[in-house]
Curated annotation (Swiss-Prot):
Reactions accelerated catalytically: L-enduracididine + 2-oxoglutarate + O2 = (3S)-3-hydroxy-L-enduracididine + succinate + CO2
Region of interest called Disordered, as start-end residue ranges on this chain: 203-223
Organism for this UniProt entry: Streptomyces hygroscopicus
Name of the protein described by the UniProt record: Enduracididine beta-hydroxylase
Upper taxonomic lineage: Bacteria, Bacillati, Actinomycetota, Actinomycetes, Kitasatosporales
Superkingdom to which the source organism belongs: Bacteria
Disruption phenotype: Cells produce dideoxy-mannopeptimycins.
Pathway terms, separated by semicolons: Antibiotic biosynthesis
Residues that hold Fe cation according to the record: 146, 148, 300
Family: Belongs to the clavaminate synthase family.
Cofactor annotation remark: Binds 1 Fe(2+) ion per subunit.
């Protein structure tokens, strides 16, 4: 795990850029903001840019924690209780901008039409009625470790989580495939395209389509829903391990791989699952901390906790970050848009 501790002058420089942009934009969902964000990311301190560049290019570790950004708890207001809560401007606008710009040093933040109503900036907080679900709104059940959006060929390269509030010290669990030891036979099996992954529940909760969307957007949205339905009905077989044999990437989501494997495949999954459990570590994020997770190297999850639903619960912001937007061009409305259908 790599750590970047922001110094006072780093924070001052980031704040100056965030202040300027927060006067011009009231949301990071603005396409104009997204178009300019890369330019402003280049104005972040060289020390910050170097740390993110080295993390991206060297792959020395799949986890990078950035600490030191300020968060005024009183200015945030209550932790939202409803997943549709999206005020404009956000009470965390300055933090959102800083988070977005730092994420831009890894790639382009993206959203999903089938997840959180197509927003780029996601929320992670407990919602009543979802306590036992395997999604970001859950709380009382362990969020089983997984690759983010493992079922999807356009899954994110990096996942970013920024902590706004974590009064109970809830741990984000993580494990780098480089730390996992398995036998050669299991490795060989896992490297073959024999494993099926179902779409996770977050992609099955579809928001309401806007009434004024274009015919092309409607067509893309319907195709996206059909893809999820098809993946539920008959998921394509994929390899769990891929890339370099001795230093592989991985793609796995055990909770959504149960009951759809053959006996040999299931044994291989159980073997690597036990090895990942043995190598599992984690990080407890404090307000202002950001953790970046290489989604090709690291599985992540969350320890269980009991939510109070009183406005003081754990609250994170989340970004999915793509290294190459062109891979998803056929699934986006335009070259300038960031939502994948």
């Amino acid at each position: 795990m790599l750590t970047l501790h922001l110094q006072d002058d780093d924070v001052a420089a980031i704040d100056a850029v965030a202040d300027e942009l927060s006067r011009r934009y009231d949301s990071v969902e603005s396409t104009e903001f997204q178009a300019e964000s890369r330019l402003y990311a280049d104005e972040l301190p060289r020390r910050v840019r170097r740390a993110l560049h080295e993390y991206r290019s060297t792959e020395k570790s799949g986890i990078l924690v950035v600490t030191g950004l300020p968060v005024d708890d009183s200015a945030l207001g209550a932790t939202p209780a409803d997943r549709r809560h999206k005020p404009v401007p956000s009470t965390s606008l300055r933090q959102d901008i800083a988070f977005y710009l730092i994420a831009n040093l890894l790639g382009d933040p993206i959203g999903w039409a089938t997840q959180q109503d197509g927003f780029i900036m996601h929320d992670v907080y407990p919602v009543q009625g979802f306590e036992h679900e395997q999604i970001g709104w859950g709380s009382e059940e362990t969020l089983t470790w997984h690759t983010e959006d493992a079922f999807h060929p356009l899954r994110t390269d990096y996942l970013g989580l920024m902590c706004l509030r974590n009064p109970d010290g809830v741990e984000t669990t993580a494990c780098d495939i480089a730390d996992v030891e398995i036998d050669d036979e299991t490795r060989e099996t896992l490297s073959q395209e024999r494993f099926r992954i179902l779409p996770d529940d977050a992609h099955r909760i579809h928001g309401k389509a806007p009434g004024d969307e274009s015919a092309r957007e409607s067509a893309l949205r319907e195709r996206s829903r059909q893809r999820v339905a098809s993946a539920l009905e008959s998921p394509d077989p994929v390899a769990v391990l891929f890339g370099d044999r001795d230093d592989p990437y991985l793609r796995i989501d055990p909770h959504y791989m149960q009951g759809v494997q053959g006996e040999t495949e299931q044994r291989a999954l159980e073997t690597i699952g036990a090895a990942i459990d043995d190598a599992m570590s984690g990080v407890v994020l404090s307000p202002g901390d950001i953790v970046f997770i290489d989604n090709y190297r690291v599985v992540h999850g969350r320890k269980p906790f009991r939510a109070r639903f009183d406005g003081t619960d754990r609250w994170l912001r989340r970004l999915n970050i793509a290294r190459d937007l062109r891979k998803s061009r056929e699934a986006r409305l335009a070259a300038t848009t960031r939502v994948i259908y």
